[in-house]
Amino acid sequence: MSLNIFWFLPTHGDGKYLGTSDGARAVDHGYLQQIAQAADRLGFGGVLIPTGRSCEDSWLVAASLIPVTQHLKFLVALRPGIISPTVAARQAATLDRLSNGRALFNLVTGGDPDELAGDGLHLNHQERYEASVEFTRIWRKVLEGENVDYDGKHIQVKGAKLLYPPIQQPRPPLYFGGSSEAAQDLAAEQVELYLTWGEPPAAVAEKIAQVREKAAAQGREVRFGIRLHVIVRETNEEAWAAADRLISHLDDETIARAQASLARFDSVGQQRMAALHGGNRDNLEVSPNLWAGVGLVRGGAGTALVGDGPTVAARVKEYADLGIDTFIFSGYPHLEESYRVAELLFPHLDVQRPEQPKTRGYVSPFGEMVANDILPKSVSQS
């Protein structure tokens, strides 16, 4: 099975280390453009653009990067409760047309009650999922060209329609991740691809089985994806040393403050991430080569696959064997790590790469000339 490999745009900040300003990097449009163009040239299928008050607006970022990329798809957040589903459908169709069919959408219900209240959304966890189901039903039908009347508990529309359809038919694909039963019910009914954060394979297998069963009960099939960080190096020892360096500036106070802040979230997925490490920096390898160090201070995806290329590829294949065909990776800093993943991991996987245009480079594809005159030898694979 060919795998779809996506990268990540760090619109909330980037750097060499977690939890410190040391080694931090200014994330401006030029830097995001560098990462997007690198991902495009290296053969990543798309990029996930995060959402939330700590991030630049994902829609504007995606639109700004369309002219400087050729094949890269943009996985952009849909926020039920923050925007009307009919307006969101028009925006989605426009982005899909502007990008010539490179738009994908990620339904994000939100998990931070404080942030949601700041955006004017005052619904509890269950109510947010009720509203998200209504939002998605309307959004899908409008994008598919239907005239929609809908009288729901949270959303009511009358005569909603779309005049300018998207490039992708019947509409751009919808992605979604959530670990609660309400989230799985939504996924089974509404989405094309269900995402999970990087839990141990046994836990992921259980979630996949649950969603697959719920979807089958509705006569549907759902694809599956996973969101993970990656720390890949030429040797396993180098990879684990890089993982240690990533959290080398973290002190106990910073970890405690981060965990206290994340504890207010009502996201079941966030609670499952936190349970993997318990706020303790000891014993962070929670499954072979699955490291929970990122989650000590980062919300959302908090685990990384760590190892050399063949080792990480073997772990990726374990997840693929569960039915996962889409992997959304990231690494710190995101520009350099995109190259490491492409150079050290891709050769060991069957990666579904966008077709690249045939161009003639200004320099040879063999690396730097030896003594200005000799073509370097290729390294034998043994």
UniProtKB/Swiss-Prot annotation:
Catalytic activity: an alkanesulfonate + FMNH2 + O2 = an aldehyde + FMN + sulfite + H2O + 2 H(+)
Protein keywords: Flavoprotein, FMN, Monooxygenase, Oxidoreductase
Top-tier EC class: oxidoreductase
UniProt KW Manganese keyword: no
Gene Ontology terms: biological process: alkanesulfonate catabolic process
UniProt xrefs under Gene3D superfamilies: Luciferase-like domain (3.20.20.30)
EC number(s) from the headed UniProt entry: 1.14.14.5
Keyword Oxidoreductase: yes
InterPro entries: Alkanesulphonate_mOase_FMN-dep, Luciferase-like_dom, Luciferase-like_sf, SsuD_RutA_monooxygenase
Subunit structure: Homotetramer.
Function: Catalyzes the desulfonation of aliphatic sulfonates.
Family affiliation: Belongs to the SsuD family.
Misc. remarks from the entry: FMNH(2) which is absolutely required for this enzymatic reaction, is provided by SsuE.
Name of protein: Alkanesulfonate monooxygenase
Gene: ssuD
